[in-house]
């Protein structure tokens, strides 16, 4: 079993020789802008998106923290339960956060979500898909 929430990887670690080769060929004196743009273009092409619709980061935590900082002023809205870092990063940047509570079977009714959006008027709504911790995949 791979515990993705613990950042476990199904891949074997690189060998010392592989790491040495990677480090030897890395250009540490330049920002990796060219590689980043190539990655975005390739990812966008694969998913039939525009590169402007793609942002990459050093894991989901970095991107969640950035969202909490750059989104318009106002509360965030998230599912409850869901990934605990939504609340942690909202608290870190003093952003209010409200929640849509799960039904007893850990599912979320779309009407309840829409009603909560209407009530809270959040700056943005954030959710994990598949849902954490139930693993339910939502068709968006």
Give the positions of each predicted feature.
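Short hydrophobic alpha-helical segments of the AMP-binding
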Residues: 43, 90
């Amino acid at each position: 079993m791979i515990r993705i929430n613990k950042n476990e990887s199904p891949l074997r670690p690189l060998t010392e020789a592989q790491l040495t080769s990677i480090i030897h060929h890395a250009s540490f004196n330049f920002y990796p802008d060219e590689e980043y743009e190539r990655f975005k273009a390739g990812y966008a092409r694969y998913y039939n998106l525009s590169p402007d619709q793609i942002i990459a980061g050093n894991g989901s935590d970095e991107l969640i923290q950035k969202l909490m900082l750059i989104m318009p002023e106002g509360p965030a809205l998230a599912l409850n339960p869901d990934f605990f870092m939504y609340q942690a990063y909202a608290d870190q940047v003093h952003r209010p956060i409200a929640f849509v509570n799960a039904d007893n079977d850990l599912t979320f009714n779309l009407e309840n979500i829409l009603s909560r959006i209407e009530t809270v008027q959040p700056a943005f709504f954030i959710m994990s898909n598949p849902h954490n911790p139930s693993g339910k995949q939502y068709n968006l």
